[in-house]
Amino acid sequence: MKIIYPAVFHKENNQYWVEFPDLEGCHTYGESLEETLFYAKEALELYAATLLENGEKLIPPTNISSIATDENSFATLIYGDIDNYLSSGKAVKKTLTIPEWVNQIGIEHNINFSQTLTDAILHQYMR
């Protein structure tokens, strides 16, 4: 299944981070623009595959021309193909322990813990 969603790239302190306005909690970062583009595609694919595997639906993407950016950001379209993720098996449940204060920050900022852990593992693996 091919998907295309708009993403907003932000530059801060010579690093980049990216968010998908239509996909709450779907974001990643990189040391360079090239690395961030790679991780953006991966984050989009993993996020979309996880939604579908959980029986949820993808919302239609926003028209990129309606996305506002500032001088340190830009919007672009990210293409993804989630067939490989969907055929690679179901998500597995993991039990882990994190400091209570980290958990509280995550809850307060609506951080998707599963997505964050997945992103972190893939980020370490790709290095």
Features from the language model and the residues they span:
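Surface loops and adjacent helix of pleckstrin homology
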Residues: 21, 31, 108
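Residues that mark the N-terminal boundary/hinge immediately upstream of a DNA-recognition element
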Residues: 32, 112-113
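ATP/adenylate-binding site constellation spanning eukaryotic-like Ser/Thr protein kinases
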Residues: 23, 41, 110
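Short, proline-centered helix/strand-breaking motifs
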Residues: 21-24, 99
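N-terminal segment of the canonical double-stranded RNA-binding domain
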Residues: 1-14, 19, 105
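A short, exposed loop/beta-hairpin motif centered on an aromatic-Gly-Thr core
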Residues: 24-34
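Short, charged, surface-exposed hinge/linker loops at domain edges
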Residues: 2-4, 45-109, 115-123, 127
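A short, charged, amphipathic alpha-helix used as a generic interaction element across diverse proteins
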Residues: 32-49
